Amino acid sequence: MTHPTELPLSPLSALQFYATAPYPCSYLDGRIARSQVATPSHLINSDIYTELVKAGFRRSGVFTYRPYCDGCRACVPVRVPVGAFTPSRTQRRMWKRHRALVATVSPLHYDEEHYALYMRYQSARHAGGGMDRDSRDQYEQFLLQSRINSRLVEFRDLDAPAGEPGKLRMVSMIDILGDGLSSVYTFFEPDDQHTSYGTYNILWQIEQAKSLGLPYVYLGYWIRESPKMAYKANFHPLEGLLDGRWKVLDPDRVELPPVDAALARAPLPGGHSGSG
């Protein structure tokens, strides 16, 4: 099976690409997913990863992949062109509400307080999804392993007793690419009411990209049918990778290839269904 997006020959010619076996889609119930994986991982440096991201790839730890599903093209890679971005009135309110948070940028590292917040977040937001049972090793493999230029950003309250850090509210992992920032993963305090940490985090990344002279913030995949991904459509303008080209995306009007239900919902090998 071939995809409409063709990989450039250089600097990716040293890599090999293979398709995974089918597995249950984690975004759309009842769908079957596959990924295309770039290997070997030790050859994927920041320059090569930049080219891979522009071709629709993402990473989880040192695992670099993009959707490669039979009969489904629901996952659309998206990015925000920071020079053209204009925050909405709601986003300006969110920025003002959380602007007192103090952001500290550091290399990837393990911190017990971060891990505890991650587990609270998973238990509250994604209970039963598997990640709410992640061990420390799984957490580190997922978020703290990287062979590229990655950073950990923690957001804390400004007010704290003298000599003590403010309360931890949010942690974000980002990759610094040749042409932008790539948002890897963000988790935050789930018990805080009337907050918009996720949106604030993207606004913060947009401001950081501007200050670094980088033109884009890559947000991963937007999926029209997935409520988890709906927030990405609130950033305007938004560009999507469609038919191998980045173009301005109108989430309400974009025409995506129809899903081949017979393929997208085919049973997994061994008689397992794609639901879950």
Swiss-Prot record:
This is Aspartate/glutamate leucyltransferase. It is found in: Cytoplasm. It catalyses: N-terminal L-glutamyl-[protein] + L-leucyl-tRNA(Leu) = N-terminal L-leucyl-L-glutamyl-[protein] + tRNA(Leu) + H(+); N-terminal L-aspartyl-[protein] + L-leucyl-tRNA(Leu) = N-terminal L-leucyl-L-aspartyl-[protein] + tRNA(Leu) + H(+). Keywords: Acyltransferase, Cytoplasm, Transferase. Belongs to the R-transferase family. Bpt subfamily. One of its GO terms (cellular component) is cytoplasm. It comes from Burkholderia ambifaria (strain ATCC BAA-244 / DSM 16087 / CCUG 44356 / LMG 19182 / AMMD). One of its GO terms (biological process) is ubiquitin-dependent protein catabolic process via the N-end rule pathway. InterPro entries: Acyl_CoA_acyltransferase (IPR016181), Asp_Glu_LeuTrfase (IPR017138), N-end_Aminoacyl_Trfase (IPR030700), N-end_Aminoacyl_Trfase_C (IPR007472), N-end_Aminoacyl_Trfase_N (IPR007471). It is an enzyme of class 2 (transferase). One of its GO terms (molecular function) is arginyl-tRNA--protein transferase activity. Signal peptide: none annotated.
